Amino acid sequence: MGKPSGLRCARKLXNRRRDQKWHDXXYKKSHLGTALKANPFGGASHAKGIVLEKIGVEAKQPNSAIRKCVRVQLIKNGKKITAFVPNDGCLNYIEENDEVLVAGFGRSGHAVGDIPGVRFKIVKVANVSLHALFTGKKERPRS
């Protein structure tokens, strides 16, 4: 039995479409609001947080490396996330209890490359751009 067809079936078709929409994964995700609740940033592009600890995350096969990451507790909601520290030696600019600005990292809601479970990256440390510290254009403020 297919969909109804006839002169007076518009309401039936409209209701059928409304019900069947919920079986579409992408529609359900965008309209239920659960994806927004699960997102640590709560829909924002960036978030500030406090560094809890520095950690090394092992890269997935076939690569062999320890990717430098930090555990961050977000100020806005207290959620704890793992954020990647880009560039060589930039972990040295970050200390525990520093305030950092965290941004998304590549594919939304997914880990990037060979770093398992890491969906965010560090952008600023103590309100100074991590890239500026790395290139030597700015110095870390004395605290």
Swiss-Prot record:
Hydroxyproline: residues carrying this PTM: 62
Gene assigned in the entry: RPS23
Family statement: Belongs to the universal ribosomal protein uS12 family.
Protein name: Small ribosomal subunit protein uS12
GO cellular component: cytosolic small ribosomal subunit; ribosome; rough endoplasmic reticulum
Principal place of residence: cytoplasm
Subcellular location: Cytoplasm, Cytosol; Cytoplasm; Rough endoplasmic reticulum
Taxon lineage: Eukaryota, Metazoa, Chordata, Tunicata, Ascidiacea
SUPFAM superfamilies the UniProt entry points to: Nucleic acid-binding proteins
GO molecular function, one term: structural constituent of ribosome
Subunit relationships: Component of the 40S small ribosomal subunit.
Keywords recorded for this protein, A-Z: Cytoplasm, Endoplasmic reticulum, Hydroxylation, Ribonucleoprotein, Ribosomal protein
